[in-house]
Amino acid sequence: MLYAGIGSRQTPQNVMKAMTDIAQQLGAQEWTLRSGHAGGADMAFELGALKTCSPMEIFLPWARFNGAPRTTEYKVPD
């Protein structure tokens, strides 16, 4: 199963904590996160997915966007 973990770069801290918790719960059930590695909400979802080592597909506008690592989870357009 897939879910999109996206939102505002200006998401309040308490909401980002909830997003991280949700991503952890979904990750524990093997859901795959799709997101964009932007600050704020995207990063909160990504943190939750990373905590459970769950699958991710992170779509970047360019290589190393926001310091993204060069791993197969991080996708850059050709």
Question: Would you name each region that the model predicts?
Answer:
Residues 1-4, 9-78:
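Acidic/glycine-enriched connector segments
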